[in-house]
Amino acid sequence: MATTISNLPRELIEEILSRVPLRAMKAMRLTCKSWNNLSKSESFMKMHIGKAATREEKTMMVAVMPHTLALVSVVVDGVNPSTELKGQFSFLDKEFFIYRVIHYEGLLLCILKDATRIVVWNPYLGQERWIQIRYSHRPHGVDHFKYAVGYADKVSCRSVKLLRFLDYFHKASDKPFFWYEIYDFDSCLWTTLDITPHWGISWTYPRVSLKGNTYWPAREMNTKGFQDHIICFDFTSERFGPLLPLPRAQGCHVSLSCVKEEKLAVLLKHRLHHDSYEYEFEIWITTKIDVEMVSWSKFLRMDMRPKIKLPLSFYVDEEKKVFMGFDHGEYPKLFLNIIGETGFLRKLDLGVHEGHRSPCSYVPSLVQIKHPAGDKMIKQSSLEDRRFAQNSLRLAAIEKLIN
């Protein structure tokens, strides 16, 4: 009698199915109930992610399209770098338009054109969580709130949280307005945080998630010029740490990235001479980092031939000594510049339009996105209701002044 795959030992079935590409995981789970259950086991997920990370040594990224996310792989071999469109993740009804995507250690925070809701999504596990926004602030169609997703390590599991904040310095207002709030995925509650910042975080500078916390380029509030520090939000204590120094403090454009979910990389662009317009790039990588301390080591220095702009998003391959940065100079196409120790290597067409937003890195994650238990809904406290009402009234007053 012929042996079917269902008759094979569980360990062998795991080994076979762990070779399924990431883009085909949804179809595999729908094939049969036993495969779906097996794919959710911790042993299978660790094996599958391990194979996906090492297979062909590819860098994975997702590009935002109106209703789907395209999965793109980049292979850097030093001779013939290449990109490949691997497929698409689709989870939203056509009525929902993806406005922006932010990647946090395998979780994707999708900001929608619908200003009333956002969604946190784990494409690898096929899990998503819709969150109702308490107050939308989008002057001229631009969401001015800043977002971060992270987690607090508990004894038995990771508790996922969403940080949302607004630090307003509009000249029409008589004084600065700050609103920091956090959403707990376990309790389904919003909490207004008591934070008065002495720092400034620019809306245009991308954040980086590392080991459950989030880092931004930042500077002292009453100073002018470039961001010359970084700052971390600790999702366990629900507090910001102190301003941490960058390796070069003055006169640099700054962009952050993550190296294998273990280190931070900072890209610094600065003038070679005070009175010239010749620039160079430096990339530094952390040797130690936590909420309250950081140390850096220089990784790569690049000249500007051919001239490239400072990318808001970039990647680093530490082993191959390679930098990959996005090039927006040939709208509507989007390219990836690849530069190594020996100089410029290749300019690759990513095959997606800039109108679909810049890609972000993607690393599969085992972080579970819990759904609220319908019979255990907790009501917001009266104190939180008052705090929310006060902030809503103040922000509404500012909106009238600036509109």
Swiss-Prot record:
InterPro entries: F-box-assoc_dom_typ1, F-box-assoc_interact_dom, F-box-like_dom_sf, F-box_dom, SCF_F-box_component. Pfam families: F-box, FBA_1. Residues 2-47 form the F-box domain. This is Putative F-box protein At5g41500. It comes from Arabidopsis thaliana (Mouse-ear cress).
